[in-house]
């Protein structure tokens, strides 16, 4: 259901319980997190440093971990993969080369904790945070994920200890048709309609609905969200070929404005929005998803 006035809805994504106690640029000392030593990631991906000079280039950042899991009176399970999405970012938001360098030179640990009965995996980057960076991992130094979202096996019956054995940074360049808010919208305080797909993933920010689409609605404040809600059943999710955990939505061209977006114009193409989600994310549309207002830049605070 759409909610036009509840700005706090988006705040749950900015400050969810797992890391609410840790403010910007406050990194947790390693000895408070784990006995293991931090590990530095390897690199795979579509990195072309020439792209750092192109403002309309976007990349998706993911940490892919291999962990050993041990529990009391149970055999250690080795080589368990974990998928840890860090977010999608454009060069308008932060220089690509600086982001990749900061991620690759960081040392990481992984721990597990429970909050309100829900098990979480927390990734901790040791070192200095970058307060204004769009990616939470670089801004605050730690990021938490629901365990069953990022680890494909079910380890829900016991408290486990994680030992990080391998870590890879995956950088995937988004195709040229990717829509992102233009620079002035991105660094300003404009909120966009967005679709919430998972409580612990940021909402998917959508382009502005064309004016004629919400003239039908009597309340102008609810207009953009109600217009989105009315067409959720039309949205279809596609897995992006040859990309890991990257999905896209092609939006109806007659409903959405692309003028303020960064996508390269290709005739009458519809806006295409890309987002990160687990590989088993359902492709059966967005019915019953919540529509919210969201900032394109997650470093902004709701007002």
Curated annotation (Swiss-Prot):
Segments forming a coiled coil: none
Membrane topology per record: Peripheral membrane protein
Subcellular location: Virion membrane; Host late endosome membrane; Host cell membrane; Host endomembrane system
Key words, A-Z: Host cell membrane, Host endosome, Host membrane, Host-virus interaction, Inhibition of host innate immune response by virus, Inhibition of host interferon signaling pathway by virus, Inhibition of host JAK1 by virus, Interferon antiviral system evasion, Membrane, Viral budding, Viral budding via the host ESCRT complexes, Viral immunoevasion, Viral matrix protein, Viral release from host cell, Virion
GO cellular component: host cell endomembrane system; host cell late endosome membrane; host cell plasma membrane; membrane; virion membrane
Primary location class: virion
GO molecular function annotation: structural constituent of virion
GO terms of biological process kind: symbiont-mediated suppression of host innate immune response; symbiont-mediated suppression of host JAK-STAT cascade via inhibition of JAK1 activity; symbiont-mediated suppression of host type I interferon-mediated signaling pathway; viral budding via host ESCRT complex
Family annotation (SUPFAM superfamilies): EV matrix protein (SSF50012)
Annotated motif PPXY motif, positions: 16-19
Function description: Plays an essential role virus particle assembly and budding. Promotes virus assembly and budding by interacting with host proteins of the multivesicular body pathway. The interaction with host E3 ubiquitin ligase SMURF2 facilitates virus budding. The interaction with the nucleocapsid and the plasma membrane may also facilitate virus budding. Specific interactions with membrane-associated GP and VP24 during the budding process may also occur. May play a role in genome replication.
Family statement: Belongs to the filoviridae matrix protein VP40 family.
Comment on protein domains: Late-budding domains (L domains) are short sequence motifs essential for viral particle budding. They recruit proteins of the host ESCRT machinery (Endosomal Sorting Complex Required for Transport) or ESCRT-associated proteins. VP40 contains one L domain: a PPXY motif which potentially interacts with the WW domain 3 of NEDD4 E3 ubiquitin ligase and the three WW domains of SMURF2 E3 ubiquitin ligase.
Extra information: Most abundant protein in the virion.
Subunit structure: Exists as a dimer until it reorganizes at the plasma membrane into multimeric form. Interacts with host TSG101. Interacts (via PPXY motif) with SMURF2 (via WW domains); the interaction positively regulates virus budding.
Protein name per Swiss-Prot or TrEMBL: Matrix protein VP40
UniProt organism field: Lake Victoria marburgvirus (strain Popp-67)
Gene name for this UniProt entry: VP40
């Amino acid at each position: 259901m759409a909610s036009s006035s509840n700005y706090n809805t988006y705040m749950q994504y900015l400050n969810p319980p797992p890391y609410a106690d840790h403010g910007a640029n406050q990194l947790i000392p390693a000895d408070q997190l784990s006995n293991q030593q931090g590990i530095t990631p390897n690199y795979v991906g579509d990195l072309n440093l020439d792209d750092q000079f192109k403002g309309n280039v976007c990349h998706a950042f993911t940490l892919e971990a291999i962990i050993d899991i041990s529990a009391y009176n149970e055999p250690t399970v080795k080589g368990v993969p974990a998928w840890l999405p860090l977010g999608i970012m454009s060069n308008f938001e932060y220089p690509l080369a600086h982001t990749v360098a900061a991620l690759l030179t960081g040392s990481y640990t992984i721990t597990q904790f429970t909050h309100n009965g829900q098990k979480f995996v927390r990734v901790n980057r040791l070192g200095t945070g970058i307060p204004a960076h769009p990616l939470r991992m670089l801004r605050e130094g730690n990021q938490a994920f629901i365990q069953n979202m990022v680890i494909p096996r079910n380890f829900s019956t016991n408290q486990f200890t994680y030992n990080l054995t391998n870590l890879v940074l995956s950088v995937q360049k988004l195709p040229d048709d990717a829509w992102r808010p233009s620079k002035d919208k991105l660094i300003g305080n404009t909120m966009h309609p967005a679709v919430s797909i998972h409580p612990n993933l940021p909402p998917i920010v959508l382009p502005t609905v064309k004016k004629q689409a919400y003239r039908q609605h009597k309340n102008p404040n609810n207009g953009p969200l109600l217009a989105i809600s009315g067409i959720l059943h039309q949205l279809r999710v596609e897995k992006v070929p040859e990309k890991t955990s990257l999905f896209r939505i092609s939006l109806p061209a007659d409903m959405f404005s692309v003028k303020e977006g960064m996508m390269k114009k290709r005739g009458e193409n519809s806006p295409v929005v890309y987002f990160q989600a687990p590989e088993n994310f359902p492709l059966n549309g967005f019915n019953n998803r919540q529509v919210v207002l969201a900032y394109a830049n997650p470093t902004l605070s709701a007002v």
